[in-house]
Design a protein with these regions (language model features):
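Non-catalytic, surface beta->alpha helical segment in thiol-disulfide oxidoreductase systems
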Residues: 1-3, 353-356, 362-396
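Short, internal strand/loop/helix patches
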Residues: 321-358, 362
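Structural microenvironment flanking redox-active thiols in thiol-disulfide oxidoreductases
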Residues: 287-327, 341-345
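N-proximal helix/coil linker or "cap" segments that precede and/or mark the start of modular domains
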Residues: 199-255, 267-271, 318, 322-325, ...
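A non-transmembrane, solvent-exposed segment enriched in polar/low-complexity residues
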Residues: 1-91, 101-102, 106-133, 140
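Short active-site neighborhood of thiol/selenol oxidoreductases, capturing the structured segment around
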Residues: 263-293, 307-309
Length: 396
């Protein structure tokens, strides 16, 4: 049994357990009277949908199915019309706020034609949907965060966006700007978008996390956080910032097992791409992943000049050498370790578990991270294709 409760409300209600929705009555709460007007309507709609589902199950021909689907679409439109009329009738009610939050832009089923009359405007529906997505959402009513609606609205919207930092940062600024005068909505929005950026599996999205920390947390806008919690965000951003995609790779200078020194900065200019790998021979996942990386590099090396700069992280020299020998990890590999703990690679490259991999181009720029054997070849193919396209544009 659900009802709407705001601070300071005093009201009473009566109902029968036999049918709580149909028998619910309220005294002293116009809000809930309106809400249960809708709940009772939903009961009748539910009965109609059940009848439609039964008809669909019994449909024998395409014509039967099409007729039932039309009934379902008509009923959906009836619900939209009911909600729109409800909003007009009770515009100040919280239920109206909810209905507005639930609404989605209406876009044509097919893409319209461009002015030339020959080409479809293939992004029109996307642009329209995205551009009108928040039109009816009330960014000034903090109560909405106590429903599941706002989180779902954010999830759907950020899934809709192109997952690149510039796009995410722009939309984060838009939403946080809209909620800046609504403390609870702002707090929830900043928390949600920060978590989205920090936990994203999409390569490069950590740039958005750093952006949020630098532009909101460090500027004192997360006023609800204790100093210790705020410092954790700032510290995490500082560790990520130097190794984001697009940043120059910080040099690593370490010896191999024979004491010969090798530097990352002298390696990447000699290859089209260099894979910087941090791994441990005692790590179970590394024991499986590193041989797979070698298989992958043998394929990639037929396409481009490819090298691997592999840093052993745990000073397990005997196991390290054995794993290299057993898996023939020699061609295109440079193996180094840090027996004197002089390189500070864990902080520089955010290495707190293994394996960790970065892809570095010929100019020393980080072009990939959060990698494994399954996606490195695809990333290089993409980068090579982009280089070719950019070169063709320059010649035109």
């Amino acid at each position: 049994f659900e009802f709407i409760l705001s601070n300071g409300d005093e009201f009473s209600f009566e109902l029968s357990k036999a049918d709580m929705v149909k028998t619910a009555s309220f005294k002293g709460s116009e809000e809930n009277l309106h809400f249960y007007e809708y709940q009772k309507y939903l009961t009748t709609i539910g009965d109609k949908y059940q009848a439609i589902n039964n008809e669909l199950a019994a449909a024998k021909t395409k014509a039967d199915t099409a007729a039932v689907n039309k009934k379902s679409k008509d009923l959906s439109n009836e619900m939209k019309e009911y909600r729109n009329n409800f909003v007009k009738k009770y515009p100040s009610s919280f239920t109206a706020v909810v209905f507005n939050a639930l609404s989605e832009p209406e876009v044509p089923e097919k893409d319209p034609m461009l002015p030339d009359g020959k080409t479809k405007d293939s992004t029109y529906r996307y642009r329209t949907f995205k551009g009108e997505y928040w039109n009816r959402f009330n960014f000034t009513d903090d109560r909405i965060i106590y429903t599941p609606l706002y989180e779902k609205k954010l999830e759907d919207y950020f899934k809709l966006l192109v997952p690149v930092p510039d796009s995410i940062n722009k939309e984060a600024d838009f939403i946080l700007g809209k909620t800046k005068n609504s403390p609870d909505l702002f707090k929830y929005s900043l928390w949600w978008i920060t978590r989205f950026a920090e936990t994203s599996k999409v390569m490069g999205m950590d740039e958005s996390f750093v952006y949020l920390v630098e532009n909101y947390y460090q500027k004192g806008l997360a006023t609800w956080l204790a100093d210790s919690s705020l410092e954790k965000y700032i510290d995490r951003a500082k560790k990520i910032a130097p190794n984001m995609v697009g940043q120059p790779a910080i040099d690593v200078r370490l010896p191999d097992i024979d004491g010969n020194m090798h530097t990352l900065s002298s390696t990447y200019p000699t290859a089209d791409y260099t894979l910087l790998v941090f791994w441990s021979p005692t790590c179970g996942h590394c024991q499986k992943e590193i041989p797979r990386v070698d298989s992958m590099q043998r394929i990639i090396s037929k396409k481009v000049n490819f090298k691997i700069f592999a840093v052993e992280t745990d000073q397990e020299d005997e196991k390290w050498v054995k794993l290299i020998k057993d898996n023939d990890l020699n061609k295109n590999w440079i193996h180094v370790h840090d027996p004197q703990h002089t390189s500070n690679f864990r902080a520089t490259y955010d290495v707190y578990s293994t394996p960790v991999m970065y892809l570095i181009d010929k100019n020393g720029k980080i072009v990939g991270k959060k990698l494994d054997h399954s996606n490195i070849e695809g990333l290089i193919d993409f980068l090579e294709k982009k280089k070719k396209q950019d070169a063709e544009k320059k010649t035109k």
